[in-house]
Amino acid sequence: MAVAANKRSVMNLYSHADDMYSHQTRIALAEKGVGVDIHLVDMDNLPDDLFELNPYGTIPTLIDRDLALYEAKIIIEYLDERFPHPPLMPVYPVSRGRSRLMMHRIEQDWYSLAKIILSGPADAASKARTELRESLLSIAPILNEAPYFMSEDFSLVDCYLAPLLWRLPVFGIELDGQGSKELKTYMLRLFERESFQASLTETERELRFGNPV
């Protein structure tokens, strides 16, 4: 799989076909129009050269010439600084700080619930599913304020949210009731972006097959 392989300098990304963190990096790369060769790896059979580049053998791992980066947050912020246009973070320090805090909260509050839903005991998964659904619906007022999450422009915060929202059918979460209209509108806006569509693996496309927003 390759994203925009004819643009700018070609990088290499070790990615999983269905992983929220890998998905974040693929969205950011597509937004930047960066040439990248994407290597989809089997987590049960990691390539030896990955450990030569990343001592932890974790996914995603980005290679840019002699630089190897791992951890999605580090990778996407590096990409935003390495390729300034289009910017995916606010210009002003206070706004940048708020964006970083929001990304941290999304990971701590929502990604953690997603992990429980996917791999936790049945009772814990059911509780996490309810908590995640209610928490997502509660942000509806924020989504009424701007086209993207607390911003007029697509940002790294949206890169964090999009992979999570795309997987709601997998989590067994249906959106209805108060706040669902606003959230669904926001989701469609994200999912219809050219960069988001370019970021999807075949595995990820199948996640929503027959599961419209």
Where are these regions (language model features)?
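GST-like domain detector, emphasizing the conserved glutathione-binding G-site
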Residues: M1-P141, P147
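GST-like fold's C-terminal all-alpha helical module
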Residues: I106-S199
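A generic membrane alpha-helix/interface feature
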Residues: F51, P60, A125, V170-F171, ...
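Short, solvent-exposed turn/loop segments enriched in Gly/Ser/Thr/Pro and often Arg
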Residues: H16, L156, T203
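Acidic/histidine-enriched, glycine/proline-rich intrinsically disordered or flexible terminal extensions
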Residues: E202-V213
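Feature targets compositionally biased, intrinsically disordered low-complexity regions
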Residues: M1, D176-Q178, F209
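Residue-level detector of family-conserved "landmark" positions at structurally sensitive sites
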Residues: H39, A72, Q178, L200-T201
